[in-house]
């Protein structure tokens, strides 16, 4: 065991105690203060070289971050399904990007541990929240994880997305290696569905469930305006499995009763193994100030 004093200018010194496990290329330990409060610490040795490569992990992985069941349809909690796209290189190098369930864009990089773990820590919302935890990439090309997400208050005076924040939530993370296909999933059609985030009370809600024809070039074409009055469109990126779309919703104004348009934007990732895509949509409230934005779940289904 190695004990390292960590001096601080205020609050007393800290003590870092580490135990190294050379055979496992890892270490564990604790970081404690003078009052014996402590947190656990773990890490791994950087083992990847041009000789000992991470080629057995090297790929693009699409993972989703879903709320646990008790948080479903809780209006004070963002209801979108977040996602991360993780690119793993041959020397353990990783780059990842995605969105959280409130539409917040996330991006970062790091080093894959020898056992396929990828730690993530992001400070968000002007340091009033975070996204932190570990992705686990397995040799069977699946992704799981233990990641938590929180927001304690508005990030700025202009913040209009779940302004009061929400307590720490442990997300359900699943995913797989992305396998490019033409067309994706070998499908000829893909269908949309939307849930939560206030979408069910929209006047045109039932018209959002649409089925598009999928070409061999991965172009998704929806019917004309007579059967697709919200003009839903989706663009697929077959190399990564990302999908991005929009629709225009028309509701009566809550005061004037005149038709009022709102743009529903959404994005997500496809899962080669599950043959389904999940993601997050953003929906501005009807124009009664202040206009706030709610989020919910979007799903793209193959037959």
Tell me what each language-model feature is:
Residues 1-303:
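Mature soluble binding/inhibitory domains
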């Amino acid at each position: 065991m190695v004990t390292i004093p960590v001096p601080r200018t205020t609050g007393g010194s800290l003590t870092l105690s580490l135990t190294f496990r050379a055979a496992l290329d890892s270490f564990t330990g604790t970081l404690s203060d003078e009052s014996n409060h402590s947190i656990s610490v773990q890490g791994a040795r950087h083992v990847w070289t041009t000789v000992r490569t991470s080629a057995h992990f090297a790929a693009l992985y699409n993972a989703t971050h879903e709320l646990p069941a008790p948080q479903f349809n809780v209006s004070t909690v963002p209801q979108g399904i977040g996602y991360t796209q993780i690119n793993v290189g041959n020397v353990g190098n990783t780059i990842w990007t995605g969105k959280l369930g409130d539409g917040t864009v996330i991006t970062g990089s790091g080093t894959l541990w020898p056992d396929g773990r990828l730690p993530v820590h992001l400070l968000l919302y002007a340091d009033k929240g975070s996204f932190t935890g570990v992705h686990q990439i397995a040799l069977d090309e699946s992704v799981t994880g233990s990641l938590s997400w929180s927001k304690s208050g508005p990030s700025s005076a202009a913040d209009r997305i779940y302004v009061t924040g929400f307590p720490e939530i442990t997300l359900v993370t699943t995913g797989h290696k992305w396998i490019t296909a033409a067309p994706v999933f070998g499908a000829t059609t893909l269908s949309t569905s939307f849930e939560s985030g206030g979408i069910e009370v929209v006047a045109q809600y039932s018209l959002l469930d649409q089925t598009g024809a999928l070409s061999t070039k991965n172009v998704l074409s929806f019917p004309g305006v007579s059967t697709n009055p919200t003009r839903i469109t989706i663009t697929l990126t077959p190399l990564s499995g990302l999908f991005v779309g929009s629709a225009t919703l028309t509701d009566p104004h809550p005061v004037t009763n005149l038709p009022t348009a709102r743009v529903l934007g959404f994005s997500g990732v496809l899962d080669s193994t599950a043959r389904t895509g999940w993601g997050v949509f953003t929906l501005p409230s009807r124009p009664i100030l202040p206009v706030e934005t709610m989020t919910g779940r979007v799903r793209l289904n193959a037959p």
